[in-house]
Amino acid sequence: CSLTSLASVDEVAKALQVARKTGVKLIISCPELKTETVPTVRRFMKNPALAGYFLRDEPTPKDFDSLAVWVREIQRIDPSHFCYVNLLPNYADMRQLGVTDYRDYVRQFIEKIPVKLLTFDYYPVVRDTIRDSWYENLEIFSDEARKAGRVFWAFALTTAHASYPVPTPAQLRLEMFSNLAYGAQGLEYFTYRTPGSQTWDFHKGPITGDGKRTEVYDRMKEVNREI
């Protein structure tokens, strides 16, 4: 499925129509999902191309109470589709987040927010090294998800930016098969189409901004085939 953020409910409707024709399901997001939650959910909840609702990326604990209200409102209307909230990695500054450690951050989220699945992003390959807290992050996330009886999803990085290099096939395999080894039941890529951003210098994603395939597309395709 595709995680898709669009500018309006009408754009979401068009995207779902295209997705249905191509056999892709979308995790949708648009401003109205927040400002007009009930009518927006009712409009799309029976669409066969809908996978779920994207609510927030990398929330802090101060966001948890409002997110819990939002999740419950959506699930009251549509219990058949999941709400998606992607959590921070353990290299975020936990002191600034107001928690004792990363496990505390994950536990607080699980205790307060009744989502069906858990997900986090962690991009381990930086230049020619690997962050040394990566497997600890996977261990904590896997352990807390298992204790809560929830599935978890995890990422691999496919789009180079800042100090993150263009991924090699070996890097993609390392990330995805490590996710699987720790029990991930959903595998995610950041990103498919290369985002436009001068701040992050995104480049060489699987699909360029003008819609052309790069060598990363073929690498991602091969790893998917192996999985």
Where do the language-model regions lie?
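Glycan-processing catalytic domains of CAZymes
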Residues: 1-227
